[in-house]
């Protein structure tokens, strides 16, 4: 990267929640942020927010489960310094009731799309001999849980992908890590956390006794993307209030 050049940061799932929080944080710190999601209207509102605060941002409508769209997106970039691989979803179901449509949808979005985005970004980063990839995992990538067989499968896969890429891409100057949050107040989790019984059960499992915030997850992402983490690769930073320590 040339002196005084803004680092280019690509964030998938950037229209809301953790992705949007990351976009705003990178934007306020001087990065050129490319926000990626399917809903262009929501993306544009996020871009407008960043620009109004003096940041540099653009929106790209892209279905990350479509390999050609993802490759076209990265093919149109001159460089990529950081990829925040954040798009994902959850659909809790008892294991005996899991239908193939749910299995395929979560594998496609939570695993396949992240693999393809990481590959496309890494091809750019390899030319630069530098770059950072951060995969959004979950505490469920470290444990098991009832009604989350598919989600746990996908997040354990992301933990494995992170380690494999860290080893393979290190000689190319590319660091790869994961961030693994506990339950965080986002549009994705809100329907579950509004159930008082479920919320109480969750809080009982978290030693620090509270739900996480977007800002706390964003802080972990910003650290792993920063020079302060220059010797860190192949790890998963748990932001879970002690959930997995038990």
Segment roles from a protein language model:
Residues 94-95, 99-107, 202:
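Substrate-binding pocket helix/loop in short-chain dehydrogenase/reductase
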Residues 123, 167-171, 230:
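Alpha-helical segment proximal to the catalytic Tyr-Lys
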Residues 118, 154, 162:
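Active-site helix of classical SDR
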Residues 138:
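Residue(s) in the substrate-gating loop at a strand-loop-helix junction
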Residues 15-17:
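Conserved glycine-rich cofactor-binding loop
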Residues 96, 143-149, 171-172, 209, ...:
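Active-site loop immediately N-terminal to the catalytic Tyr-X3-Lys motif
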Residues 115-118, 175, 210-239, 243-245:
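C-terminal substrate-recognition "lid" of short-chain dehydrogenase/reductases
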């Amino acid at each position: 990267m040339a002196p005084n050049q803004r680092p280019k940061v690509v964030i998938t799932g950037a229209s809301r929640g953790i992705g949007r929080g990351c976009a705003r944080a990178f934007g306020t710190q001087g990065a050129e942020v490319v926000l990626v999601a399917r809903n262009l209207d929501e993306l544009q509102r996020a871009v407008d927010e960043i620009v109004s605060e003096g940041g540099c941002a653009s929106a790209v409508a892209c279905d990350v489960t479509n390999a050609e769209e993802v490759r076209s997106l990265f093919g149109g970039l001159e460089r990529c310094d950081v990829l925040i691989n954040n798009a994902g979803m959850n659909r809790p179901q008892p294991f005996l009731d899991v239908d193939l449509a749910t299995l395929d949808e979560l594998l496609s979005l939570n695993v396949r799309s992240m693999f393809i985005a990481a590959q496309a970004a890494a091809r750019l980063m390899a030319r630069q001999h530098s770059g950072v990839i951060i995969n959004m995992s979950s505490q469920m990538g470290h444990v098991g849980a009832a009604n989350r067989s598919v989600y746990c499968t996908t997040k354990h896969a992301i933990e494995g992908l992170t380690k494999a890429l860290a080893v393979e891409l290190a000689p190319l100057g590319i660091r790869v890590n994961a961030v693994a949050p506990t339950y965080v107040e986002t549009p994705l989790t809100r329907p579950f956390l509004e159930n008082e019984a479920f919320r109480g059960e969750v809080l009982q499992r978290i030693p620090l006794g509270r739900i996480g915030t977007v800002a706390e997850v964003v802080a972990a992402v910003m650290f792993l993307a920063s020079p302060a983490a220059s010797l860190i690769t192949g790890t998963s930073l748990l932001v879970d209030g002690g959930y997995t320590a038990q």
